[in-house]
Amino acid sequence: IICDDIPYFLLFNLHNDIYRTWHIYKWTPTRSLMSEEWSQSPENTLLSLRHGITHSDGIELDIRLTSDNELIVHHDSVVSIPKDRLDGRSKWVESWTLEELKQQGFCSLDDLLNDSVIENQWIEQGKMVCLEFKRPHFMSPKGRGLFKKSRQVNTLSTAMKIAESKLDERGIPNQNSVFYSFYKGMKNIIDEQSISRNWAGLLPSVPTIGTRT
């Protein structure tokens, strides 16, 4: 699997239908994969993900839960826009609604599922899509803070359950997706929520501090 922002992490203990150990390698676009006219789109946009799934064996999505319990494709814990565009709003992704984030140019999981190119590649062409569920920042309203570890777990649990429901509704084959997170408590969430999708825990278990968690 090739991804554009994960350098040399190891997936381990991939469960359910697939019992293999996979390596994820950092992808550097080359001209052999694309035409002279191609220019790289910003990461985690519909255009970049459409290009990625068309020209590779699969793609990775960074999934976060919005304030209205929708799923947005967004890597960083803070909204990836210039500070002067925050207009006094919270910087944490989980504080924004789906519509507010889409107005800033970010795409949702529904946008991907509604895209005919991605749907064809994902289902008909058998491409793999890895969904990395991002834990909210320590200080985010959906984060754990000092004494609210359960809040963080609830955020991940809700996001995974919603994602599973959406993929099931669209008929995404189980073997064409995997849920994962840099979180040592993945198994507990999978068991408690009865998630049937393939899943994996990632190492290391990344602390929820900084801006690129």
Where do the PLM segments sit?
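Phosphate-group recognition and catalysis centered on beta-loop-alpha active-site segments
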Residues: 1-213
